[in-house]
């Protein structure tokens, strides 16, 4: 609260109300979510709307991300596109460094030096089929060299506050790349917020075919024809796109040192979840892929089955009396707008709100200054708080206004002793 409040007396208005979920009403008594048994070394399940962590297991263990690294590579590309510094139609020069032959036994777009390819196609080659060659081509296109691009990746991670992130390449093949599940879930949430179209345009696409005839070098075009040429069609590495309703991203990964990794997101009934699972161990690629999909599905189902998104009505609150100001009162508004809450199923019917706000304050009052709060509780336990702030600025009044209010305050204080 502001240090210039008149006296410690604070008005407390208790407003109890039912918060009905938009998708239905639940009458069953609230029960604790059942235990979740996952083999992954590190796990985080996050609600997208609120950033609330619903489940965690060793969330701060530092682990190699493998191809989850490519999400940072894509993020930097989208930033340049959105800033007008790059276009999806820009041609990309495929150097010897980006030749698919340099990355045997790994995920590839199957680029060859001299291919006629665009930024948009490269992005698909990274997001859909996890091309390590495509990641190098994009890094060189943006920064001139892989080393310069890696420096950009680490600078961006530092600027965003992700202290566990460390990158040494744009594709994730090295075990020296580092993340934690907690920070990567936060990054995935930010990625979707900043680049929401990437889900429909890239991450949820189930297959990608390359090279098309027009991508071939003139020398390769000379020995075939559009009718004869057959591109390589590959499926998205995220098998949950086929098997789990609502999944539309994000990225899979594997390196031997870490195991099988997954960053997955799904939306059902207005609720979007983000799951990060790192370090799933298996004896073979098929086994690891199957375990990764099974654990990802189990994590998402646990979240959707046990939690619900609630958008409660805001309770009533009153303007605050302003003394010695150009106006006699200031209106309140919720900081950040109406809240979204995530509750265990069964608790939404017991949701209540307590409004605590200042009775009066001495000018000046700054717009956005905290003057109260709403405390949400379910089943008698606090679940969230929301600040109430000044909706407008109230500067000090003129000399006679301040003098008159000072006299009135003195009179009030004299008779209230």
Regions found by a protein language model. Give the residues of each.
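Periplasmic/cell-envelope proteins involved in peptidoglycan metabolism and beta-lactam response
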Residues: 2-5, 154-157, 415
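Bacterial N-terminal signal peptides that target proteins for export
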Residues: 2-15
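Helix N-cap / beta->alpha transition motif
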Residues: 3, 118, 341-344
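Catalytic-site microenvironment of enzymes
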Residues: 15, 103, 218
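C-terminal segment of classical bacterial N-terminal signal peptides
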Residues: 19-29
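Active-site-adjacent loops and short helices of periplasmic peptidoglycan-processing enzymes
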Residues: 30-194
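Domain-terminus/edge residues, biased toward the C-terminal soluble/receptor-binding domains
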Residues: 162-163, 175-179, 183-417
């Amino acid at each position: 609260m502001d240090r210039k409040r008149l006296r410690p007396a604070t008005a407390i208005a208790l407003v109890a109300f039912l918060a009905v979920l938009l998708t239905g009403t639940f009458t069953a008594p609230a029960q604790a979510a059942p235990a979740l048994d996952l083999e992954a070394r590190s796990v985080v399940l996050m609600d997208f709307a609120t950033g609330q962590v619903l489940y965690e297991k060793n969330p701060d263990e530092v682990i190699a991300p493998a191809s989850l690294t490519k999400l940072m590579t894509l993020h930097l590309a989208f930033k340049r596109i959105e800033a007008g510094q790059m276009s999806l139609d820009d041609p990309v020069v495929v150097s010897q460094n980006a030749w698919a032959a340099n990355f045997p036994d790994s995920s590839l777009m199957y680029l060859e030096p001299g291919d006629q390819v665009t930024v948009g196609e490269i992005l698909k080659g990274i997001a859909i089929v996890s091309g390590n060659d495509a990641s190098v081509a994009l890094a060189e296109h943006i920064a001139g060299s892989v080393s310069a691009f890696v420096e950009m990746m680490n600078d961006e991670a530092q600027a965003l506050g992700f202290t566990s992130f460390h990158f040494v390449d744009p594709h994730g093949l090295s075990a020296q790349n580092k993340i934690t599940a907690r920070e990567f879930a936060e990054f995935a949430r930010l990625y979707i917020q900043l680049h929401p179209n990437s889900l429909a345009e890239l991450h949820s696409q189930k297959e990608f075919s390359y090279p098309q005839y027009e991508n071939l070098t003139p020398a390769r075009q000379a020995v075939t024809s559009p009718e004869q040429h057959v591109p390589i069609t590959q499926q998205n590495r995220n098998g949950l796109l086929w098997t789990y309703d609502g999944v539309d991203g994000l990225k899979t990964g594997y390196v031997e040192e870490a195991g099988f990794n997954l960053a997955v997101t799904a939306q059902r009934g207005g609720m979007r979840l983000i799951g990060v699972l790192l370090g799933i161990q298996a004896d073979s690629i098929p086994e690891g892929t199957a375990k990764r999909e099974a654990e990802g599905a189990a994590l998402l189902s646990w979240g959707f089955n046990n939690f619900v998104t609630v958008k409660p009505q805001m309770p009533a609150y009153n303007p605050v009396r302003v003394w010695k100001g150009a106006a006699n009162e200031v209106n309140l508004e919720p900081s950040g707008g109406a809240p979204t809450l995530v509750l265990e199923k069964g608790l939404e019917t017991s949701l209540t709100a307590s409004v605590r706000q200042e009775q009066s304050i001495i000018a000046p009052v700054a717009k956005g200054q905290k003057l109260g709060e709403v405390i949400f509780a379910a089943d008698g336990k606090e679940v969230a708080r929301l600040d109430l702030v000044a909706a407008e600025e109230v500067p000090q009044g003129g000399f006679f206004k301040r003098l008159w209010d000072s006299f009135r305050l003195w009179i009030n204080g004299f008779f209230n002793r």
